[in-house]
């Protein structure tokens, strides 16, 4: 939870429902006032749901009733965006991606990575009932309908470095598919795209573990926290850095026990 807002960018509740949120950039105008931020939607879903399926539906319902947008930057009050969500519990996981009031969902079969881009194409499992007709009316559909191709804003999505991060995360998950555990997940979250990486070398934020640099394009590209949730039949174990730069941070375990963990 960023200190300056009510909502949260990632979290887990006592039922083992886990949600992560990412900003995405679309062709639709982003409302600034009297709407819910993506972080509001995430927190409300965690407060009110007991499964990934109910969390997914709750976000969709809130999206239709209140819309989304708001101020997305602490200092830059003009920074606005739409949202994507990765939602999981101990039995299933879903990707929910949005553009204004429109949305598409996809059930995760094995592994999935989201970044600052729409990723659901033709293979959605469910979609807003008017999304395809709306995109066709706007002239955004070329050939078979793809949610990401129809609704993505090319410029902001490209310069966010989202494709490189999403591809790198997917590559790491695929190469370690049969041995994904807490330890390997920590390594993934500490990953830089090159072995000789230094923050000043990259013009865009293309590392999973991002470091702010270059005042023009990457002054705000800093990983400020990281979280891993180990879901089991019992209560989840939550590993958090609670500090920026995962490559320099220690992951601390937390549990839902009803008692306050003493300072480490």
Where are the regions that the model predicts?
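Generic alpha-helical secondary-structure signal
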Residues: 57-58, 188
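Second-shell loop/turn segments in exported
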Residues: 31, 41-49
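Intrinsically disordered or highly flexible coil/loop and linker segments, enriched in small
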Residues: 51, 68-72, 198
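A contiguous strand-loop segment
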Residues: 1-38, 58-183, 237-239
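Substrate-recognition/cap regions that form aromatic- and gly/pro-loop-enriched pockets
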Residues: 206-264
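Short, charged, surface-exposed loops that flank catalytic or proteolytic processing sites
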Residues: 48-56
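Accessory "access/gating" subregions that flank catalytic or transport cores
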Residues: 165-224
């Amino acid at each position: 939870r960023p200190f300056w807002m009510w909502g949260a960018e990632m979290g887990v509740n006592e039922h083992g429902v886990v949600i992560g949120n990412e900003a995405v950039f679309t062709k639709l105008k982003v409302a600034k006032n009297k709407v819910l931020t993506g972080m509001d939607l995430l927190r409300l879903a965690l407060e009110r749901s007991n499964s990934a399926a109910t969390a997914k539906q709750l976000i969709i319902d809130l999206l239709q009733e209140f819309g989304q947008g708001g101020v997305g930057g602490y200092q830059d009050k003009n920074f606005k965006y739409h949202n994507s969500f990765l939602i999981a519990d101990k039995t299933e996981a879903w990707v929910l991606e949005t553009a204004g009031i429109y949305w598409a969902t996809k059930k995760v079969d094995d592994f999935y990575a989201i970044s600052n881009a729409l990723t659901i194409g033709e293979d959605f499992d469910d979609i807003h009932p008017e999304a395809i007709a709306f995109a066709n009316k706007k002239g955004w559909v070329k050939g078979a309908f793809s949610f990401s191709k129809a609704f993505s804003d090319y410029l902001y999505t490209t310069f966010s470095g989202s494709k490189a991060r999403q591809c790198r995360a997917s590559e790491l998950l695929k190469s370690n598919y049969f041995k994904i555990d807490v330890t390997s997940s920590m390594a993934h979250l500490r990953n830089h795209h090159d072995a000789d990486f230094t923050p000043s070398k990259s013009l865009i934020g293309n590392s999973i573990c991002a470091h702010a640099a270059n005042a023009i394009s990457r002054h705000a590209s800093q990983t400020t926290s990281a979280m891993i949730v180990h879901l089991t039949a019992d209560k989840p174990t939550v590993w958090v850095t609670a500090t920026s730069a995962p490559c320099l941070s220690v992951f601390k375990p937390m549990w839902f026990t009803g008692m306050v963990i003493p300072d480490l």
